[in-house]
Protein backbone atom coordinates (compact mmCIF):
# COMPACT_ATOMS: atom_id res chain seq x y z
CA UNK A 1 0.00 0.00 0.00
CA UNK A 2 2.79 2.42 0.90
CA UNK A 3 4.16 2.35 -2.66
CA UNK A 4 0.88 3.59 -4.16
CA UNK A 5 -0.57 5.72 -1.36
CA UNK A 6 0.35 7.45 1.87
CA UNK A 7 -1.09 5.31 4.67
CA UNK A 8 -1.13 6.82 8.14
CA UNK A 9 -1.80 4.66 11.19
CA UNK A 10 -3.66 6.31 14.05
CA UNK A 11 -3.58 4.19 17.19
CA UNK A 12 -4.39 4.33 20.88
CA UNK A 13 -1.65 1.78 21.61
CA UNK A 14 1.70 3.24 22.64
CA UNK A 15 3.44 0.39 20.77
CA UNK A 16 2.55 2.23 17.55
CA UNK A 17 5.84 4.07 18.09
CA UNK A 18 7.67 0.98 16.80
CA UNK A 19 5.96 0.98 13.41
CA UNK A 20 7.68 3.91 11.63
CA UNK A 21 11.18 2.46 12.04
CA UNK A 22 10.04 -1.07 11.16
CA UNK A 23 7.85 -0.30 8.15
CA UNK A 24 8.48 3.32 7.22
CA UNK A 25 4.82 4.22 7.76
CA UNK A 26 3.77 7.44 9.45
CA UNK A 27 1.93 6.95 12.73
CA UNK A 28 -0.07 9.14 15.08
CA UNK A 29 -0.72 8.29 18.72
CA UNK A 30 -4.03 9.24 20.32
CA UNK A 31 -4.48 8.56 24.07
CA UNK A 32 -7.33 6.12 24.62
CA UNK A 33 -10.39 6.65 26.75
CA UNK A 34 -8.99 4.19 29.28
CA UNK A 35 -6.38 6.78 30.26
CA UNK A 36 -9.14 8.51 32.18
CA UNK A 37 -7.82 11.96 31.37
CA UNK A 38 -11.18 13.29 30.11
CA UNK A 39 -14.81 12.23 30.18
CA UNK A 40 -16.09 9.84 27.51
CA UNK A 41 -18.06 12.57 25.75
CA UNK A 42 -15.06 14.89 25.64
CA UNK A 43 -12.84 12.05 24.48
CA UNK A 44 -15.17 11.35 21.54
CA UNK A 45 -14.97 15.04 20.59
CA UNK A 46 -11.17 14.90 20.86
CA UNK A 47 -10.98 11.84 18.59
CA UNK A 48 -13.30 13.50 16.08
CA UNK A 49 -11.28 16.70 15.98
CA UNK A 50 -7.89 14.97 15.70
CA UNK A 51 -9.04 12.74 12.85
CA UNK A 52 -10.69 15.65 11.04
CA UNK A 53 -7.42 17.58 11.36
CA UNK A 54 -5.51 14.65 9.84
CA UNK A 55 -8.02 14.35 7.00
CA UNK A 56 -7.61 18.04 6.22
CA UNK A 57 -3.83 17.92 6.53
CA UNK A 58 -3.36 14.90 4.26
CA UNK A 59 -6.37 15.20 1.94
CA UNK A 60 -7.29 11.65 2.95
CA UNK A 61 -9.76 9.82 0.73
CA UNK A 62 -10.42 6.75 2.90
CA UNK A 63 -10.84 6.33 6.65
CA UNK A 64 -10.44 2.76 7.94
CA UNK A 65 -11.40 1.60 11.42
CA UNK A 66 -9.73 -1.66 12.50
CA UNK A 67 -11.42 -2.88 15.66
CA UNK A 68 -14.49 -4.34 17.31
CA UNK A 69 -16.65 -1.28 17.97
CA UNK A 70 -16.30 1.87 15.83
CA UNK A 71 -15.92 4.77 18.23
CA UNK A 72 -18.50 7.56 18.07
CA UNK A 73 -15.71 10.07 17.51
CA UNK A 74 -14.48 8.09 14.53
CA UNK A 75 -17.88 8.06 12.84
CA UNK A 76 -18.37 11.74 13.70
CA UNK A 77 -15.10 12.57 11.93
CA UNK A 78 -16.38 11.08 8.69
CA UNK A 79 -19.72 12.84 9.12
CA UNK A 80 -17.77 16.10 9.35
CA UNK A 81 -16.00 15.22 6.09
CA UNK A 82 -18.66 13.26 4.15
CA UNK A 83 -16.58 12.96 0.98
CA UNK A 84 -14.25 10.56 2.80
CA UNK A 85 -15.12 6.86 2.41
CA UNK A 86 -15.60 5.02 5.68
CA UNK A 87 -14.37 1.40 5.96
CA UNK A 88 -14.71 -0.99 8.90
CA UNK A 89 -12.03 -3.69 9.10
CA UNK A 90 -14.21 -6.10 11.05
CA UNK A 91 -12.82 -9.48 12.01
CA UNK A 92 -15.14 -12.44 12.40
CA UNK A 93 -15.43 -15.00 15.22
CA UNK A 94 -17.33 -12.75 17.61
CA UNK A 95 -18.64 -14.15 20.85
CA UNK A 96 -22.35 -13.68 21.47
CA UNK A 97 -22.02 -10.70 23.78
CA UNK A 98 -24.03 -7.51 24.11
CA UNK A 99 -22.03 -5.71 21.39
CA UNK A 100 -23.78 -7.85 18.79
CA UNK A 101 -26.97 -5.84 19.11
CA UNK A 102 -25.25 -2.76 17.67
CA UNK A 103 -23.98 -4.62 14.59
CA UNK A 104 -26.79 -3.63 12.17
CA UNK A 105 -26.58 0.07 13.02
CA UNK A 106 -22.78 0.18 12.99
CA UNK A 107 -22.54 -1.73 9.72
CA UNK A 108 -25.09 0.57 8.08
CA UNK A 109 -22.96 3.59 9.02
CA UNK A 110 -20.09 2.28 6.88
CA UNK A 111 -19.47 2.63 3.17
CA UNK A 112 -17.65 -0.71 3.18
CA UNK A 113 -17.03 -3.57 5.62
CA UNK A 114 -13.99 -5.78 5.03
CA UNK A 115 -13.52 -9.03 6.94
CA UNK A 116 -9.96 -10.40 7.03
CA UNK A 117 -10.10 -14.15 6.51
CA UNK A 118 -9.64 -16.49 9.46
CA UNK A 119 -8.14 -19.97 9.33
CA UNK A 120 -10.98 -21.03 11.64
CA UNK A 121 -13.79 -19.47 9.59
CA UNK A 122 -15.61 -22.83 9.43
CA UNK A 123 -16.10 -22.65 13.21
CA UNK A 124 -17.51 -19.12 13.14
CA UNK A 125 -21.14 -19.28 14.29
CA UNK A 126 -21.15 -15.87 15.93
CA UNK A 127 -23.09 -12.66 15.21
CA UNK A 128 -21.08 -11.67 12.11
CA UNK A 129 -21.10 -15.09 10.44
CA UNK A 130 -24.47 -14.76 8.72
CA UNK A 131 -24.18 -11.10 7.79
CA UNK A 132 -23.74 -10.33 4.11
CA UNK A 133 -22.29 -6.81 3.90
CA UNK A 134 -18.66 -7.80 4.47
CA UNK A 135 -16.10 -8.32 1.73
CA UNK A 136 -14.11 -11.36 2.87
CA UNK A 137 -10.43 -11.76 2.02
CA UNK A 138 -7.65 -14.26 2.63
CA UNK A 139 -6.14 -14.30 6.14
CA UNK A 140 -3.90 -11.39 7.11
CA UNK A 141 -0.54 -11.83 8.83
CA UNK A 142 2.63 -9.90 9.53
CA UNK A 143 4.43 -13.18 8.80
CA UNK A 144 5.47 -13.40 5.17
CA UNK A 145 7.84 -16.21 4.21
CA UNK A 146 9.60 -14.01 1.65
CA UNK A 147 10.49 -11.43 4.31
CA UNK A 148 11.25 -13.71 7.28
CA UNK A 149 14.81 -14.31 8.44
CA UNK A 150 16.23 -17.83 8.56
CA UNK A 151 16.92 -19.62 11.83
CA UNK A 152 20.53 -18.49 12.23
CA UNK A 153 19.83 -14.86 11.37
CA UNK A 154 16.73 -14.82 13.58
CA UNK A 155 18.67 -16.11 16.57
CA UNK A 156 21.45 -13.62 15.98
CA UNK A 157 18.89 -10.81 15.89
CA UNK A 158 17.42 -11.95 19.22
CA UNK A 159 20.71 -12.81 20.91
CA UNK A 160 19.81 -16.48 21.35
CA UNK A 161 22.20 -19.41 21.58
CA UNK A 162 22.36 -21.12 18.20
CA UNK A 163 22.83 -24.61 19.64
CA UNK A 164 20.04 -24.66 22.25
CA UNK A 165 16.28 -25.10 21.76
CA UNK A 166 14.07 -22.05 22.25
CA UNK A 167 10.35 -21.61 22.92
CA UNK A 168 8.39 -18.39 22.51
CA UNK A 169 5.75 -17.73 25.20
CA UNK A 170 3.20 -15.00 24.42
CA UNK A 171 0.57 -14.96 27.14
CA UNK A 172 -0.92 -11.98 28.91
CA UNK A 173 -0.54 -11.22 32.60
CA UNK A 174 -2.26 -8.86 35.04
CA UNK A 175 -5.54 -10.48 36.02
CA UNK A 176 -5.26 -13.34 38.52
CA UNK A 177 -6.46 -15.99 36.07
CA UNK A 178 -4.04 -14.78 33.39
CA UNK A 179 -1.16 -14.96 35.87
CA UNK A 180 -2.11 -18.51 36.81
CA UNK A 181 -2.21 -19.53 33.14
CA UNK A 182 1.25 -18.07 32.58
CA UNK A 183 2.67 -20.05 35.50
CA UNK A 184 0.92 -23.24 34.39
CA UNK A 185 2.29 -22.89 30.87
CA UNK A 186 5.84 -22.26 32.06
CA UNK A 187 5.65 -25.34 34.30
CA UNK A 188 5.06 -27.41 31.18
CA UNK A 189 8.50 -26.38 29.88
CA UNK A 190 10.39 -27.66 32.94
CA UNK A 191 12.60 -30.60 32.05
CA UNK A 192 13.27 -29.62 28.42
CA UNK A 193 17.07 -29.92 28.28
CA UNK A 194 19.02 -26.67 27.69
CA UNK A 195 15.83 -24.77 26.84
CA UNK A 196 15.75 -21.01 26.30
CA UNK A 197 12.32 -19.64 27.27
CA UNK A 198 11.69 -16.40 25.42
CA UNK A 199 9.07 -13.84 26.46
CA UNK A 200 8.26 -10.34 25.26
CA UNK A 201 7.76 -8.97 28.77
CA UNK A 202 8.73 -9.94 32.29
CA UNK A 203 6.47 -12.67 33.73
CA UNK A 204 5.54 -10.82 36.91
CA UNK A 205 2.31 -9.93 38.69
CA UNK A 206 1.20 -6.43 39.67
CA UNK A 207 3.29 -6.53 42.83
CA UNK A 208 6.43 -7.47 40.90
CA UNK A 209 6.46 -11.11 42.02
CA UNK A 210 7.75 -13.55 39.43
CA UNK A 211 5.22 -15.91 37.87
CA UNK A 212 7.93 -18.25 36.60
CA UNK A 213 8.80 -21.50 38.39
CA UNK A 214 12.39 -22.22 39.32
CA UNK A 215 14.66 -24.00 36.88
CA UNK A 216 13.93 -22.14 33.64
CA UNK A 217 16.33 -19.98 31.64
CA UNK A 218 14.16 -16.95 30.83
CA UNK A 219 15.04 -14.35 28.22
CA UNK A 220 12.93 -11.22 27.73
CA UNK A 221 13.30 -9.74 24.25
CA UNK A 222 12.22 -6.57 22.47
CA UNK A 223 11.96 -7.01 18.72
CA UNK A 224 9.45 -5.73 16.18
CA UNK A 225 8.01 -7.24 14.14
CA UNK A 226 8.48 -10.56 15.90
CA UNK A 227 6.90 -12.30 12.91
CA UNK A 228 10.15 -11.72 11.04
CA UNK A 229 12.19 -13.90 13.43
CA UNK A 230 9.83 -16.78 14.24
CA UNK A 231 12.30 -19.21 12.66
CA UNK A 232 14.38 -18.75 15.82
CA UNK A 233 11.98 -20.89 17.82
CA UNK A 234 11.33 -24.61 18.13
CA UNK A 235 7.81 -24.10 19.50
CA UNK A 236 5.42 -21.47 20.80
CA UNK A 237 2.79 -20.98 23.48
CA UNK A 238 0.34 -18.17 22.84
CA UNK A 239 -3.18 -16.91 23.28
CA UNK A 240 -5.58 -17.71 20.45
CA UNK A 241 -5.97 -14.17 19.16
CA UNK A 242 -6.18 -13.45 15.45
CA UNK A 243 -2.64 -12.12 15.08
CA UNK A 244 -0.90 -14.82 17.11
CA UNK A 245 -2.57 -17.70 15.27
CA UNK A 246 -2.05 -16.24 11.81
CA UNK A 247 1.60 -15.51 12.51
CA UNK A 248 2.80 -18.59 14.39
CA UNK A 249 0.87 -21.14 12.36
CA UNK A 250 1.75 -19.45 9.07
CA UNK A 251 5.39 -19.77 10.15
CA UNK A 252 4.79 -23.51 10.77
CA UNK A 253 5.72 -23.10 14.43
CA UNK A 254 4.48 -25.96 16.65
CA UNK A 255 2.14 -24.16 19.02
CA UNK A 256 0.00 -24.64 22.12
CA UNK A 257 -2.99 -22.29 22.23
CA UNK A 258 -4.26 -20.99 25.58
CA UNK A 259 -7.37 -18.93 24.96
CA UNK A 260 -8.30 -15.64 26.57
CA UNK A 261 -12.09 -15.57 26.85
CA UNK A 262 -12.44 -12.03 28.24
CA UNK A 263 -12.76 -10.10 24.98
CA UNK A 264 -15.16 -10.15 22.05
CA UNK A 265 -12.97 -12.50 20.01
CA UNK A 266 -14.12 -16.13 20.20
CA UNK A 267 -10.67 -17.53 20.86
CA UNK A 268 -12.01 -20.87 22.01
CA UNK A 269 -13.71 -21.48 18.65
CA UNK A 270 -10.45 -20.66 16.86
CA UNK A 271 -8.48 -22.91 19.21
CA UNK A 272 -10.89 -25.81 18.71
CA UNK A 273 -10.60 -25.56 14.93
CA UNK A 274 -6.80 -25.48 15.06
CA UNK A 275 -6.76 -28.47 17.41
CA UNK A 276 -9.45 -30.52 15.67
CA UNK A 277 -7.63 -30.35 12.34
CA UNK A 278 -4.14 -30.91 13.75
CA UNK A 279 -2.62 -27.46 13.22
CA UNK A 280 -2.00 -26.73 16.91
CA UNK A 281 -2.61 -28.11 20.39
CA UNK A 282 -5.48 -26.58 22.37
CA UNK A 283 -5.05 -26.34 26.12
CA UNK A 284 -8.18 -26.14 28.24
CA UNK A 285 -7.96 -22.52 29.41
CA UNK A 286 -10.11 -23.34 32.46
CA UNK A 287 -7.85 -26.19 33.67
CA UNK A 288 -4.38 -25.22 34.89
CA UNK A 289 -3.17 -28.82 35.04
CA UNK A 290 -4.29 -29.35 31.45
CA UNK A 291 -2.38 -26.25 30.36
CA UNK A 292 0.79 -27.64 31.95
CA UNK A 293 0.34 -31.11 30.46
CA UNK A 294 -0.51 -29.79 26.99
CA UNK A 295 2.54 -27.51 26.91
CA UNK A 296 4.64 -30.47 28.04
CA UNK A 297 3.67 -32.26 24.81
CA UNK A 298 5.81 -29.76 22.91
CA UNK A 299 8.88 -31.44 24.38
CA UNK A 300 8.21 -34.41 22.08
CA UNK A 301 10.11 -33.83 18.79
CA UNK A 302 7.67 -36.08 16.93
CA UNK A 303 4.74 -33.95 18.08
CA UNK A 304 6.53 -30.79 16.98
CA UNK A 305 7.33 -32.28 13.60
CA UNK A 306 3.71 -33.37 13.11
CA UNK A 307 2.31 -29.92 13.90
CA UNK A 308 4.82 -28.14 11.70
CA UNK A 309 4.15 -30.52 8.80
CA UNK A 310 0.40 -30.00 9.11
CA UNK A 311 0.74 -26.20 9.18
CA UNK A 312 2.40 -26.35 5.77
CA UNK A 313 -1.08 -27.12 4.38
CA UNK A 314 -2.50 -23.77 5.51
CA UNK A 315 -3.15 -21.18 2.79
CA UNK A 316 -0.72 -18.30 2.44
CA UNK A 317 -1.87 -15.26 4.47
CA UNK A 318 -2.07 -12.87 1.51
CA UNK A 319 -5.09 -10.94 2.75
CA UNK A 320 -3.02 -7.83 3.46
CA UNK A 321 -2.26 -7.39 -0.22
CA UNK A 322 -5.90 -8.03 -1.14
CA UNK A 323 -7.11 -5.42 1.32
CA UNK A 324 -4.53 -2.87 0.16
CA UNK A 325 -5.74 -3.27 -3.43
CA UNK A 326 -9.37 -2.88 -2.35
CA UNK A 327 -8.57 0.29 -0.43
CA UNK A 328 -6.76 1.74 -3.44
CA UNK A 329 -9.83 1.09 -5.58
CA UNK A 330 -12.09 2.69 -2.98
CA UNK A 331 -9.83 5.74 -2.89
CA UNK A 332 -9.71 6.11 -6.68
For each predicted feature, which ranges?
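Conserved nucleotide-sugar phosphate-binding/catalytic loop shared by glycosyltransferases and other
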Residues: 3-53
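Conserved donor-nucleotide binding/catalytic region of nucleotide-linked donor-dependent transferases
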Residues: 281, 286-314
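Short N-terminal targeting/anchoring amphipathic segment
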Residues: 52-70
Amino acid sequence: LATNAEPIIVSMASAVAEIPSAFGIRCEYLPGENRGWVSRSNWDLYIRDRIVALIDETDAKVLVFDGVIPHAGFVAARNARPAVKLVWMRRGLWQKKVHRFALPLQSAAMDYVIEPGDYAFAYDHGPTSKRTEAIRTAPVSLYQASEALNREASRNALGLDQSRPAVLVQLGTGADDANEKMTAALKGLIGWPDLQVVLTKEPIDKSGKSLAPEGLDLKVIKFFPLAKVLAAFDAGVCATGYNGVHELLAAKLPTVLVSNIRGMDDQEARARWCHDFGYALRANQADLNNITETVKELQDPNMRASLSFKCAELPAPIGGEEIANKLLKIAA
